[in-house]
Amino acid sequence: GNWVLKTAVKQCADWRKVLTDFHIGVNISYVQLCQDNITEMVLDTITEAGIPGDALTLEVTESMELQDYSYFNKIFYEWKRHGIHIAIDDFGTGYSSLGYLKSIDVDEIKIDRCFVSRIYCNNYNYRLMSNIIKLAHSSQIQVCCEGVETEEELTSLQQLIPDFLQGFLFAKPYTKEELEKLYMCKESLEYQERVERERKLYQISTIEEKNVTAENERDEIVNIVEGMDEVIYVSDIDTYE
């Protein structure tokens, strides 16, 4: 676990020489969090690599049971004080409950794919996802929906306005060499194909965002009218318009 963290942070530092705002997320396990020196080890790792804390997100494996909230919150507080972002991975599985949102001091929850899959034809999951996102946002917690694989899922999720979307629809896992071709070599065919694919996805997102805005405006007008005790209609006496 610690080797993975150090290797990932070192790689992040290398890529930031090309992409200056590159950000990396690394899983951190319950076993690691229970190490006596974990707080200092993480801070020493980013210092040695020469990257700022805000270039790193530590994704806590959500399926584990974090019973000692005060202990873990002290660790998270120290990391966050140095700019490190804390996320709960696979939210909604294992020991998860909405109680995490009031007990653990995190910046982000990553909602598991089981809630995302075919959300466009599952009203229960859609309502549940909507409520989770609203509750998280009310606590100033960002939301990432994991496992987005189809344009239909993207369209439905856009209506719920999460902060981030993640999944094979946008990108699959890449090797170091593949990622560099896709994001750092502008002359490569892979880079150009990625840009075109992302442009099309952006168009889908923009169209859906406009539709949601229009729906919200209509709903607002309906709510105003329904909230009135009396509605007076004024029309032209000749044309009735």
PLM regions with names:
Residues 6, 29-36, 48, 55-69, ...:
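EAL-family c-di-GMP phosphodiesterase catalytic domain
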